[in-house]
Amino acid sequence: MCQILERVMPMDELIERHTMFPYYGRFCNKDKKKEAFESLVNMDANHKKILPIPIMKKEGERFLRYCPMCAKIDRNTYGEAYYHRSHQMVGVNICPIHKCELRRSTVAVVDNRLSRLEVPEFVIPNNAPILISNSPIECQLAEYIYQLFQQNVDFDSEVTIGQFLKSKIEGTKYLSVRGERRYVSLLYKDLCKYYQELPQHTVPEVWLLQKIFNDQKINVVSICQLCMFLGVPVDELTCLKLPPKTQTELFEEKAVEMRKGGMRFNQIAQELGVCTSTIQLIGKHQPRKAKVYTVKTHEKRNWEQMDHTSVERQIHC
């Protein structure tokens, strides 16, 4: 099978351009990303254990989806309809291009079972209803995710998505002044308000946000919702990078500098907007100057000379 496919294009290009790997694999860490990609190249099905592909237990069986407007264009352009991978992004329910509701076909997305070849031209109807989304925020989010989906996958960055997101809330009200405490409940509240017109009001809850920040869970739509809310450009998500220094490091450096300038702990605390104990704690962790000990040296005493001098004194007395 691999040899037949490679006659058309290289296997790595086929995976990046014609599978869902860029959607599910983009936010995996470096090692898992490479492992999943190699699994797809080798076609050993091990990628299912690595990639965060959701198991649709509540919703039941998943089916391939299509956009009625895309199908019409395909028929006029190519003579037949076909499936688009951009319509299979779980969590995105409208076409990113035409903003109409995606329709469900009769072709199930199977797992370990053998599937029959279902030609899209015979499955996708000509008269499917076209329902345009009336939610601007849903359209904006779908386009944001689609733009990211089209980008190349970076295999070199060591930065995890959790680390990246932490850096993006630095300097905001969602992180303490020192940068060591996240206010996730406040973030969740603002996310709900920002996405209140999103159909089904699907916003990541507090527990999921915590897991995403801690690199314990990957949910593509939730990550994109968070990034779009924080104003992160799509380009920055294609190659994750961190600032030279964290907010915590910058805060501590400033506190130390102010201390060296002669300010007292309480003055520094008041200036930086934290409690005095926080500044004192930073001061304790700073290396102290080593004390310089001096050793007094004495000339070596001549005991014989001292005895002779002592005897002479006694005679004269």
Q: What residues fall within each predicted segment?
A:
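Basic, alpha-helical nucleic-acid-binding regions used in initiation and control of genome expression
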Residues: M1-C317
